Amino acid sequence: MDMEAGKTLTNEEVIRELLELLKKNAMKEQANDVFEICSYVDGLEKKIDSMTEELTNMQNQIKEMQEDTLVNNAKKALSEAQERLNTRREQIKSQVLEVKAQVKSTAKSVVDEGKAKGRTALYRVSEFLGIKKRLLDIRENVRGAIKTTDKDIAKTALLA
């Protein structure tokens, strides 16, 4: 896992601290929501790592293809599809890293304020709902990338 030194969001100290603070203040449902969001971000990071590996394999296979007209057409189509997918993966990776940073900074802010002002400050945990909306948007972006890739694969299969 190459994203941010491979540390999962669920293992971040500030996230653990926030979860503990929420549980101590009988806010188990909010703690579960925060943990669910963090787990989802961790899962997205793993999927992006898998995409990276698949794209690398795809690129290596394209390089190994033989030289003839039909294969060259398929090779060109595959290369274009691979480039589009790689661009999409980079965009998604960037979005996930932004969300991860947002989760960490929101958690730190809520924890710091919770320590200073007590339980009422912990209700700011509702800010995580905005992050959840962003994650749902990223999920739609991933689904779009999958559909585009499936179409590219189908087109390439027709060439072969």
PLM feature spans:
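Amphipathic alpha-helical coiled-coil segments
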Residues: 88-102
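Extended, low-complexity amphipathic alpha-helical repeat segments
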Residues: 99-160
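Leu/Val/Ala/Ile-rich N-terminal alpha-helices, chiefly Sec-type signal peptides and the beginnings
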Residues: 1-90
